[in-house]
Amino acid sequence: MATATKTNDVVLEINNISVSFDGFYALTEVRTKVMRNSIHFFIGPNGAGKTTLLDIICAKTKPTSGTVIFHPKGREAVRLTGMKEYKIVREGVGRKFQVPSVFVNLTVEENMILSLKGHKGILDSIFKKPSKEDMESIRSTLERVGLEDKASERAGSLAHGQKQWLEIAMQLVQKPEIIMLDEPAAG
């Protein structure tokens, strides 16, 4: 027997998303709901539109039609479609890209500090000192992903898989309500 989905259990709604690139439809009327505290996978061959869907959710690509609705816990639903990328991140939607995006000339810890949620601008990132709570969160997150002994090393010296874990840690320390991983085991 099927049970009805409670709206407060849904964290992300994808409603009839289509995207066309010069007449070629990469996605056609994709619909799904992502439940809070769950793991979902989009599986398909190369070119199936998995990354394109994540790009639409994060506003990297504009859909031809459809909407993406985010349901943050304890707040009103937010229409992500049409928002700017940085505003989506501030709402609590995290994304780890297929190719690691870390600052290779900074240490692992410095990368983590830059990704802290409270550091919202260039000047904050340069001049604002992280709190003791921030540093504890960084330490525990690095421990969680197995990089605690690499905190003072330059990110560029890490192996590819360690860079993947660093980028995941950079998302986790922001405490997003949802995190999307694009090919996290690639490479």
Annotate each predicted stretch with a short phrase.
Residues 43-45:
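The feature captures the beta-strand-to-loop junction immediately N-terminal to the Walker
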Residues 168:
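Hydrophobic anchor residue at the start of the ABC signature
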